[in-house]
Amino acid sequence: MLIRCFHIKMALVTCFHSMLFLSAVVFIFSLDVNIRGVEASHQVFPELQSVSAVNVQLVHRTGYHFQPKKHWINDPNGPMYYKGFYHLFYQYNPKGAVWGNIVWAHSISKDLINWVALEPAIFPSKPFDKYGCWSGSATVLPGGKPVIMYTGIVTPSPVNTQVQNFAVPANYSDPYLREWIKPDNNPIVRARSENSSSFRDPTTAWFDGVHWKILVGSRRKHRGIAYLYRSRNFLKWTKAKHPLHSKDRTGMWECLDFYPVAPKGMNGLDTSVTGQDIKHVLKVSLYSTRYEYYTVGEYDRDNDIYVPDNTSVDGWAGLRYDYGNFYASKTFFDPDKQRRILWGWANESDSKQDDVQKGWAGIQLIPRKLWLDPNGKQLIQWPIEEIQLLRGQNVHMGSQVLNTGEHIEVKGVTAAQADVDATFSFKSLDRAEWFDPNWAKLDALDVCDWMGSTVRGGLGPFGFLTLASEKLEEYTPVFFRVFKTKDKLKVLMCSDAKRSSTTAEGLYKPPFAGYVDVDLSDKKISLRSLIDNSVVESFGAHGRTCITSRVYPKIAIYNNAHVFVFNNGTEAITIDSLDAWSMKAPSLMNNN
């Protein structure tokens, strides 16, 4: 039946209908189950967490993404710009390649590309963080003085009682901020009536002229909650009478982020900026699904209430920064270039045994600049401009027609480590397939799973075959498929790892997908992919939809990797322009 559904279009429709009930049932039971959007960051492997790497394997290790020299990393923490340096703290296991022994590792950079690792900034050492120093944020106070707030664990697993602590630099004149002090009056925020084992990840604070305010993520049964706290001096905090926002059937909210966005233009705003036309973004990382969701809405500063716009779906069906392997993200305002920058973590999709063997696990994705789409409904994301410093050999293609079933290789670049940016066009929208209304009840990845890159369509599938072997035994397709409904077009974007590796066992190879809110009246759409050995970060329609995949090819590695442009729709596709660059490694990557 599966083979028939995959190859026969009419059977596909039947299979979709038969799966609707199953999908609904699966969701009901998924609230407390990890469905591996990203694997749990706090999953414990006691027998592995202190197994230090002897040899670091380079196969599948990224060439230009942020990684420590070895071992495990997860959440980005407290990013900021201070005295000419970008600072990134991150959850790190100095003793092994799985989660455990977590400290706040610390790296600095002048350009967000080249990084120098310093000594860990925060590590368990006092009663208020004896059993762990978990995620948090940085705030720059008046006078340019940074302060970190983080979650401390005060009882051992499985209880993991959580409190909120602060730390300050030992020397404000040190631009490297090499040493941090944890004052003895910690913790400064304790759970009272809140769930103390689900109470973590304080946000960057904002100032309303009288009070500093932060959010702490939590839950009450299946309701996700953003608790709000106020302080006049950043030391004594009082919980507000009501949360800033909450939502039923979403489970634990962790790694919250809350910040303003300008209604027009691409510049970012300081976290404390408010105004009549200013929109706000609330992002939550859902522990139950391992995906992140955000809404765009209005912040009532006087009453400390956030209300998502009517056009912004609140909950598990809402907008995501990234529809793939992307979690625990954190933004910060860069005052040097007046932009808001997004950091996100991508975990591995292989086995824990693989991670221990190769000696490392986890990467931080390329930082992205964020701004509000002119339509006001969603964010646009784009790799920071500094990534262009790593571009090498360039190849250009233009006015190239792709007929049904054709694929063309992009030659002349290192396909295992490349930046590929293309604009596609088509003469007509008439051949777009009809979108069955019942499919709206399915997640986009279900549609992608059944209607993949090899299933003949009308307008699409078309896009890239990344990290591909010469004979296509392995490849990770990133592509669009255009559907039509009675009143509009619906664009599906996919990054499908099912054929990414001939390795049969131990790998998680899912299809990831999201819909693209884009105007196709000019019959054009763009696609950009950052390819780096075991990661493919893709940006559809100039960053309106983003998808990250982690893949582990067995054949398509190093010089045996290829990248193709393909079309498997009946409508001919034109490559208006395509530029591809070989990507060099940074000169400095955490002392590696």
Curated annotation (Swiss-Prot):
Q: Name one GO biological process term.
A: carbohydrate metabolic process
Annotated glycan sites: 171, 195, 310, 347, 568
Supply the InterPro entries for this chain.
ConA-like_dom_sf, Fructan_Metab_Enzymes, Glyco_hydro_32, Glyco_hydro_32_AS, Glyco_hydro_32_C, Glyco_hydro_32_N, Glyco_hydro_beta-prop_sf
From the UniProt annotation, give the residues forming the signal peptide. Answer: 1-40
Q: What is its main location?
A: secreted
Catalysed reaction per UniProt? Hydrolysis of terminal non-reducing beta-D-fructofuranoside residues in beta-D-fructofuranosides
- SMART domains per the record? Glyco_32
Q: Where in the cell is it found?
A: Secreted, Cell wall
Q: Which UniProt keywords apply?
A: Cell wall, Glycoprotein, Glycosidase, Hydrolase, Secreted, Signal, Zymogen
| Molecular-function GO terms, alphabetical | beta-fructofuranosidase activity
Pfam families, per this entry? Glyco_hydro_32C, Glyco_hydro_32N
What's the domain of life for this entry? Eukaryota
Q: Which sites are catalytic?
A: 75
Q: EC number(s) per UniProt?
A: 3.2.1.26
Q: What is this protein called?
A: Beta-fructofuranosidase, insoluble isoenzyme 2
Organism whose genome encodes this protein: Daucus carota (Wild carrot)
